[in-house]
């Protein structure tokens, strides 16, 4: 499971002043915005920059480590993807596994998968998931309690920071909403960019899928997610990390540490035929 897929459930919920420049210290004294209004602005701004994201492709390198009950690594797998956006949807094309480029049948199978996904993305309105479920910011804020809003500087930029925790008594529908009730964490919102700069989330209780028959996510499972500005008005993911502890189908224990690094951002142009072939013609960003 990709780090961004895990963070997708909660990514929209998503130092000190000593020694900071004068501008940052002044910002720290400014009145805090209303958090629901701020998050609505974040959501609206994201819709505005979706087309701009489609001008970029980048590389995502992921390492997955399986661990035993004592925390010792028993297996390590790596994967490298070429990622790009179509109609507001992220498309991930696998190009390497365990350091070896995909070839032959594996490459053909991946091309077929990505081509179908691109076609589906072209027909799916932005904001609607290609797979699984989604949850709006306004709905998420109905499920979460927001606490301790404050100002901090994150990576040299002023941010609005707040903690959140799911309300156990909230009425929910669907997997994403049900999971949100058992999450807690902290989100850093870049004030100028209106983007989630950093997100840290953990499960504060067991979360059972299908009553535990399909899967159980244990308390303490956690993940983080980072974004950074690529150009004026555009932010893209730079990486993330997750520690997952749980069980599949009642019998198989799942203990994994997953890390992802996103890099090599490039400008590209997708032609009609290229979209159908799931290939991109890219040029390095100056």
Report residues per predicted region.
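Structured extracytoplasmic
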Residues: 25-184, 191-197, 202-222, 226-239, ...
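N-terminal secretory signal peptides that target proteins for export/translocation
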Residues: 1-3
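Bacterial N-terminal signal peptides
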Residues: 8-17
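Juxtamembrane cytosolic interface motif at the C-terminal end of transmembrane helices
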Residues: 19-21
